[in-house]
Design a protein with these regions (language model features):
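Short, well-formed alpha-helical segments that are part of the catalytic scaffolds
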Residues: 29-42
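Short beta-strand/loop segment that forms part of the nucleotide-sugar
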Residues: 47-57, 80-81, 110
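Acceptor/aglycone-binding surface of glycosyltransferases and processive sugar-polymer synthases
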Residues: 82-101, 106, 118-201, 228-245
Length: 264
């Protein structure tokens, strides 16, 4: 299939059924969850499934997901419920293991609050499925600064945090803290999740750095990040602190040869 856009012909892959799954961690996302699930599963040219990892949301997020699973989103949406807030990193690791067990070839990370535009999912998929990259990153900083409705202080903190990570680790990625990604199956199969150190913001850095050190090909795909309109942000100062000091540990791990492929 060919798509004509901005005077360039772009090849778009046609996915096989059950080829890709989008992992969406949730905690108190009742305002967003139905809309985001319908937006992802409603992409006409691509059959993305969705896995929601809910950390015991007291607002009833999981109940909404179950209602949709019992209705018209049956077989497209899946749910893993956990007891309490166990951290973003452990949520994604649980999702990765589930995706591998269910034989998906492409596995995505995505926020529930529309900060990541579902319409960009095919572009990330295309980078891996057609162009041959192993990890595609929805990047806010590959072509300038593409962030909407963030306070300037937060924009600067995020931007320079990514620069700091790149400087310390040497990873050739502009948006090192991005949370909108597509992994090929083989990347996740090569990572030893038992040795992943971080649970919060630094988890996003660690997964990219690990993939890079294991020799996988990475592409940044420019996206526009839009701050959430509904619900409450889960970011905190502690999360940034983990990222700040965590990159030094990652650098040391690389220097001492601790980052190795998972043993079969």
């Amino acid at each position: 299939m060919l798509l004509l856009q901005k005077e360039h012909i772009i090849q778009i892959a046609t996915m096989q059924k059950n080829d890709a799954v989008v992992i969406i961690p949730t905690y108190n996302e009742k305002e967003n969850i139905e809309a985001i699930l319908r937006a992802v599963t409603g992409l006409e040219e691509h059959g993305f499934d969705v896995l929601v990892i809910d950390d015991g949301s007291p607002d009833g997020t999981a109940a909404i997901v179950k209602q949709l699973m019992a209705g018209d989103l049956k077989d497209r949406v899946h749910l893993v419920e956990r007891q309490g807030k166990l951290g973003l990193g452990t949520a994604y690791i649980a999702g990765f293991k589930w995706a591998l067990e269910h034989d998906y070839e492409y596995v995505f990370e995505m926020d529930a609050d529309f900060s990541h535009d579902p319409k960009d999912l095919p572009r990330l998929y295309n980078a891996c499925a057609v162009e041959g990259y192993d990890l595609a990153i929805g990047s806010r900083y590959i072509s300038g600064v593409n962030v909407v409705n963030w306070p300037m202080g937060r924009v600067l903190m995020s931007y320079f945090a990514s620069k700091y990570v790149r400087c310390v680790t040497g990873i050739p990625v502009n948006d090192t803290t991005a949370g909108f990604k597509c992994y090929k199956r083989r990347v996740l199969e090569a990572i030893d999740f038992d040795k992943i150190r971080f649970k919060g913001y630094a988890f996003q850095i660690e997964l990219k750095f690990t993939a890079y050190k294991l020799g996988f090909r990475i592409k940044e795909v420019p996206v526009i990040f839009v701050n959430r309109q509904l619900g409450v942000s889960k970011m905190s100062g502690g999360i940034f602190g983990e990222a700040l000091f965590g990159v030094m540990r990652l650098r040391w791990a690389a220097l001492t040869g601790q980052i190795k492929p998972k043993q079969a």
